[in-house]
């Protein structure tokens, strides 16, 4: 629990050290929810530090203890998709999250983004539209993804509208600004 407290206070290095020690204490009869959460947080921290291979190992361990940990499934799937790695696995994990929580805009956005990475743009458009309908935060990332998806389906007017909304919502990405200026999709 010390590691969780450190993580919540953004003391990520200390939290990672604590979790690594804690993982050494895991027994076969340990509480699977707690162990899964330990590994999930480790995965998040390792990803933030740019240690993606280690992060993915932590997520794999997390899911061995609790295969339906939706937060870990979503994060793992999204991080794989951003790297354009193992998209079939990412899609399977993400699909589990939208089945568990069909109106969760974050999960819908992740699933749409994976479909985008797989060049399944029309399907991606269906899920990003659902994400936007359910997005109470009006996330700049979701809006940028929507713009990217619409651009790839040939609807530049809609793409520009979403990119502009993303920019107005506080997204400061230099790539986003180029997309708007050049009126075309640009990969990150």
What are these regions (language model features)?
Residues 4, 44, 78-79, 113, ...:
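Residue-level recognition of tetratricopeptide repeat
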Residues 32, 38, 72, 107, ...:
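TPR alpha-solenoid repeat register
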Residues 10, 50, 84-85, 119, ...:
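Residue-level detector of the short coil/turn that links helix A to helix B
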Residues 7, 40, 47, 81-82, ...:
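Position-specific recognition of the canonical hydrophobic site in helix A of tetratricopeptide repeat
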Residues 27, 67, 102, 136-137, ...:
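Short coil turns that delineate tetratricopeptide repeat
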Residues 1, 41, 75, 110, ...:
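Canonical tetratricopeptide repeat
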């Amino acid at each position: 629990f010390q590691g969780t407290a450190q993580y919540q206070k953004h003391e990520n290095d200390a939290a990672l050290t604590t979790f690594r020690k804690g993982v050494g204490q895991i027994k076969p009869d340990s509480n699977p929810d707690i162990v899964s959460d330990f590994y999930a947080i480790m995965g998040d921290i390792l990803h933030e530090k740019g240690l993606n291979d280690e992060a993915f190992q932590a997520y794999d361990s997390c899911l061995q203890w609790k295969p339906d940990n939706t937060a870990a499934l979503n994060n793992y799937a999204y991080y794989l998709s951003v790297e354009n790695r193992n998209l079939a696995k990412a899609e399977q994990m993400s699909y589990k999250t939208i089945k568990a929580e069909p109106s969760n805009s974050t999960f819908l956005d992740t699933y749409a983004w994976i479909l985008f990475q797989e060049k399944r743009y029309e399907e991606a458009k269906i899920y990003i539209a659902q994400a936007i309908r359910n997005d109470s935060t009006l996330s700049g990332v979701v809006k940028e993804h929507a713009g990217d998806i619409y651009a790839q389906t040939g609807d530049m007017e809609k793409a520009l509208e979403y990119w502009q909304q993303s920019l107005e919502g506080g997204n400061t990405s230099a790539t986003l600004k180029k997309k708007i200026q050049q009126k075309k999709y640009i990969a990150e």
